Amino acid sequence: MTEQDKQAVKRMLAQCLSRDREVTKVVVFGSFLTSETPHDIDVAVFQDSGEGYLPLALRYRKRTRAVSRIIPLDIIPVGSRAGSGPFLAEIAKGEVIYER
């Protein structure tokens, strides 16, 4: 996947996920950023909704269906009250592609 292809995928993701008012930030992390041949894309969706993990994950997957036809997605909703830890530290190393 070329760098131009990756940029296009990130723009599509930001466009798809920015429609939901509860979404405050979208971060792409993991091997998609560093590999020339990524197998998937890890996406953290920071949001301030009171909904549970599963309904949010399903909604965001539905919104990003066009992107998933290009490359498989792993979407992780992250609540506004998320603390800290190794997983959030890994997300913090990623690239913010949208922020409200």
Please provide the spans of the model-predicted regions:
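Catalytic core of pol beta-like nucleotidyltransferases
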Residues: M1-V27, L33-P38, F46-R100
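Cell-envelope/extracellular polymer assembly enzymes that use nucleotide-activated donors
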Residues: D42
